[in-house]
Amino acid sequence: MNKNNLFSSLTLLGLFVFSSCNLDLAPEDTLSPKTYFKNGPQLELWTNHFYSLFPDVDDLAKQNADDNISSELGETLMGQRSAASENGWTWERLRDINYYLQHSNQCPDEHVRKQYDGVAYFFRAYFYFDKVKRYGDVPWYDQVLNSNDDKLLAKPRQDREIIMDSVMQDLDKAIGMLPTKKDQVRVTKWTALALKS
């Protein structure tokens, strides 16, 4: 009887000890808003891919290497380019920028957060600058869209003037947040001022 009581007591004690373990942990191999956007290096990593919005230097250099017609214009003249085959209507980077702006407030370091928020505002302005340059009127999105939000997904184009006013507001925010120290590889206050001009 004593052995049974001892065994039962140890079993119950073991159950209590192991049931108090917190096994509801976030996976360390995946990103989520709850586990990311917590510090400067994470904000920097997220905003680094915004730089792919800039034209590739290789393409610019190749265009000037000969006296032939530029490949983009050449494709248009040969009839190979159409709205369906052109990659200029992609909105992926805008989603990434808006996603960042919705979640960056989780970083407790306000100074670092403002710097990278400035990068995001600059690139949202640059994104729309390029869209207006290519297409004229476009829809303005300043939030992440859900795939089931038909009303926002089918939003009509807005007047160019409204879009450019929003671009200027984003540039003003970026100018106030970006560092003033010159940098050859990162956007700064001076980059934003150049785009605004």
What is the predicted role of each segment?
Residues 21-61:
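Membrane-proximal, proline-rich intrinsically disordered regions
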Residues 1-28:
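Bacterial Sec-dependent N-terminal signal peptides
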Residues 21-22, 58-63, 131-140:
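Proline-centered turn/helix-capping motifs that create local helix->coil transitions or kinks
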Residues 185-194:
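Aromatic-lined, polymer-binding surfaces characteristic
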Residues 37, 41-46, 54-56, 70-135, ...:
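Conserved, well-structured interaction surfaces
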Residues 141-148, 195:
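Short, conserved phosphate-binding/catalytic loop or strand-edge motifs used
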